[in-house]
């Protein structure tokens, strides 16, 4: 059992109890043999884990009147890596205890997670340049890239690296599943002080770095049931529902409408209609015409 899963179990258990004594925590720990192996949890171990949890997740576990509690629960309510890790490892714990029904639990593979992700994360930690051969799907031409790794992002079941390419003198995104001959160099770099990964992608859709596309407020209408889907799983972090009618909703997003954005809306078929701005609406109409021409009889 990895230490991270033990940390996740500790966080989830304390969160569910709000406040819990060491004795209660130890009993629950020993009872969950898939995590503990049947061993109890002592104070010294818990305090060591508490320090590791604070450093790794930014979650502060405090003790008052012999009761342990999470002092900054707001961290758990925020989106981002901490919440993603908690959800992921909580799911793994549940699946590990469900081997009897493993044939009835279906998942989607993320093949790129097996390709260089650990190496890239280590390079991120050490601010070291990485080098790899990259082959785009578009042209199939392999290129050697030397990159300052800025961040990684998971999108549509693929991991991507955002970094500054030394050869092309600019920020680029790279799909891990298109990399070969990967290596970490000894050369170090300094991450720009003003770089914020979340802020950088806040006006982008997906993994695009097309800063030449103007950032706009796009208004679109979604019909039932897709309005419900979009309400449950927003298209973008800026999404707002500005109107709710009988069988439809009107949403707004603030982003750079790139190909990935249009592609995502097109995937909803006739259940989504762009209302404004006119330029974005026209671009969508042109795409629909091009799609229609593929099905016209010669």
Could you tell me what each predicted segment is?
Residues 61, 152, 182, 241-242:
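A structural signal for short hydrophobic beta-strand segments in well-ordered beta-sheet cores
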């Amino acid at each position: 059992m990895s230490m991270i899963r033990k940390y996740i179990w500790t966080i989830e258990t304390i969160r569910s109890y709000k406040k819990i004594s060491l004795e209660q925590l130890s009993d629950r720990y020993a009872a969950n043999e898939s995590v503990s192996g049947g061993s109890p949890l002592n104070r010294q171990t818990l305090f060591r884990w508490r320090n590791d949890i604070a450093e790794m997740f930014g979650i502060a576990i405090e003790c008052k009147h012999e009761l342990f509690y999470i002092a900054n629960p707001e961290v758990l309510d925020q989106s981002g890596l901490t919440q993603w890790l908690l959800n992921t490892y909580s799911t793994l714990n549940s699946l590990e205890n469900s081997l009897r029904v493993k044939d009835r639990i279906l998942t989607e593979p993320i093949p790129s997670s097996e390709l260089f992700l650990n190496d890239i994360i280590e390079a991120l930690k050490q601010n070291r340049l990485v080098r790899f051969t990259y082959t785009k799907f578009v042209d199939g031409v392999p290129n050697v890239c030397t990159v300052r790794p800025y961040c990684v992002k998971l999108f549509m079941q693929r991991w991507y690296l955002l970094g500054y390419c030394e050869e092309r003198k600019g920020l680029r995104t790279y799909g891990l599943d298109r990399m070969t001959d990967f290596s970490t160099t000894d050369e170090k770099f300094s991450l720009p002080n003003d770089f914020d990964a979340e802020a950088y992608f806040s006006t982008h859709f997906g993994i695009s770095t097309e800063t030449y596309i103007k950032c706009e407020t796009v208004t679109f209408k979604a019909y039932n049931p897709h309005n419900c889907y979009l309400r449950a799983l927003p298209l973008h972090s800026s999404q707002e529902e500005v109107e709710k009618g009988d069988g439809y909703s009107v949403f707004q997003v603030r982003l750079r409408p790139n190909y990935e954005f249009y592609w995502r809306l097109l995937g909803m078929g006739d259940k989504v209609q762009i209302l404004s701005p006119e330029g974005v609406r026209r671009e969508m109409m042109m795409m629909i015409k091009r799609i229609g021409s593929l099905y016209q009889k010669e």
